[in-house]
Amino acid sequence: MVTPLKLLNNRYRIIETLGRGGFGETFLAQDTHMPSARKCVIKHLKPVLENPEIPSWLRERFHREAATLEELGENHPQIPQLYAYFSEGEDFYLVQEWIPGLTLTQAHAQKGNFSSTAVEELLLGILPVLEFIHQRRIIHRDIKPDNIILREADGKPILIDFGIIKETMGTLVNPDGRSAYSVALGTPGYMASEQAAGRPVFSSDLYSLGLTAIFLLTGKTPQYLTSDSRTGEILWRQGAPQVSPTLAKVIDQAVRYHPRERFNSATAMAQTLQGNFSNVPMTKGDRPGNTVANGKTKSNHQPTAPTLVVGTPYNANDTQATKVYTQEFTGYTETQEGSPLMKWVVMPLVVLLVIGGGMAAGFWVTSQRRNNPPPAVEEPTEETPIPLPSLEPRPNLFETPSPIPTPATPSPEPTPSPSPSPETTSSPTEDTITPMEPEPSLDEPAPIPEPKPSPSPTISPQPSPTISIPVTPAPVPKPSPSPTPKPTVPPQISPTPQPSNTVPVIPPPENPSAETEPNLPAPPVGEKPIDPEQN
């Protein structure tokens, strides 16, 4: 028990008690080691121990949290500075800057309900402070009218009484030195549902700030506000009919029941309140606050409402938990996300890459075609002489002058005496006459595959006249069109067999192949030699 006028740490003299809470007491004291004997605030913190001996990990954690408070106070003018910290026996002490001024609770008691303009100025003055601590992954967890002081010197809102040390001191320590659970602190009514469950998020601070603004506008604490039984949303506008639409919209979103429906950052809330999306300075807190009554007043730093303690599991061996009260800051997003400048820079680059890739692929394909030209078309042309079998009936044309050899099928080879190959070109009709009997000659092409060496000249079928050899059907390529008349020949040959009845005479040897083909009708005329015999 600390008594007034007692020196703490042989240096700080207690002037009066400012308040008591679940975690200890708050005193107003003087620093006797300073020439000015400046006033300071001393927080006496009592850990929850079941063992009289303080475990070493708790001392280390208290040291880390004190270092965090020191860093915050030194880098932001709207957060009290930490002068010192020490421990005596089983208790811990923090020595902080004294802020002359009024808490929002005291200011409301003096002035009554705030106007919309005054509340907007207050929010724009405190939101940069919240953004500052949230960027360092710290959650205040106990924002309420008692923990915001309007500084007497300039009227700026000062954020006090961070919950980080309270959470450390609220850790229950078992007799074996281990922690049974940690506490989730906050003030009933100002505490969001997820914070009451021991899982505070950054928007939990915005929820508490929204309820603080409602208190300043209506004079009602959260316990006296009605809510929608279906959605859980707070119904407060009927108590502040003169509130501006913009401010009302901002407060409504800040106090949404579900964290995902609130602002994802203090910056977003400030920008919406200002009605634009310009960047709001988050570290200077240069917005003028609501000026309070003239004259020097002292600020009571103790909370007027009790702080709720909720047990949540905690691992005492987690030496990395410098800020165990914080969580991963996933809700914060930069306002310059998706800058149009980046789109104009990235899109042309993507288009150029696509075009360049297409051109490179085209060059590669053409180079491959040049290096590996497709096979020459000559091969299919060489195969074109397929009509050779249809040309083979040509040798039968030469045999036509002597249809008698038809019975002597084995002697077709000597018959190709027709040296007058040129005549073959002029008598396609005659060809049609004789093929009647050459049908068996179709069997001959199989034994006459000797022309196989000749397919090379077949590429140019015109030189047919050069082929005088009976075996080589070189002239065959020229009459390539003749194969079509072949099917028509059989019906025309039917009249020819009549003269063949008189043909059995010896004339074949008398009339060698020297006779011209145009005299093919000679067989019927052959009766003339018969006349002399009759004579």
Curated annotation (Swiss-Prot):
Amino acid composition bias (Pro residues), ranges on this chain: 402-421, 446-464, 472-498
Sequence ranges of Low complexity compositional bias: 422-435
**Reaction(s) catalysed by this chain's protein:** L-seryl-[protein] + ATP = O-phospho-L-seryl-[protein] + ADP + H(+); L-threonyl-[protein] + ATP = O-phospho-L-threonyl-[protein] + ADP + H(+)
The disulfide bridges present are none
Q: What EC number(s) does its UniProt record assign?
A: 2.7.11.1
Question: What InterPro entries does this protein's entry cite?
Answer: Kinase-like_dom_sf, Prot_kinase_dom, Protein_kinase_ATP_BS, Ser/Thr_kinase_AS
Binding locations of ATP? 18-26, 43
Residue span of region Disordered: 371-535
Give a Pfam family name.
Pkinase
Mind telling me which SMART domains this protein's record contains? Answer: S_TKc
Any transmembrane segments, and where? none
A GO molecular function assigned to this protein is: ATP binding
Top EC class for this record = transferase
> Where is the Protein kinase domain positioned along the sequence?
12-277
This protein's UniProt keywords: ATP-binding, Kinase, Nucleotide-binding, Serine/threonine-protein kinase, Transferase
Residues the record marks as active site = 142
- PANTHER family registered for this protein in UniProt: SERINE/THREONINE PROTEIN KINASE (PTHR24363), SERINE_THREONINE KINASE LIKE DOMAIN CONTAINING 1 (PTHR24363:SF0)
Similarity-based family? Belongs to the protein kinase superfamily. Ser/Thr protein kinase family.
Q: Which named protein is this?
A: Serine/threonine-protein kinase C
Question: What organism is listed for this UniProt entry?
Answer: Synechocystis sp. (strain ATCC 27184 / PCC 6803 / Kazusa)
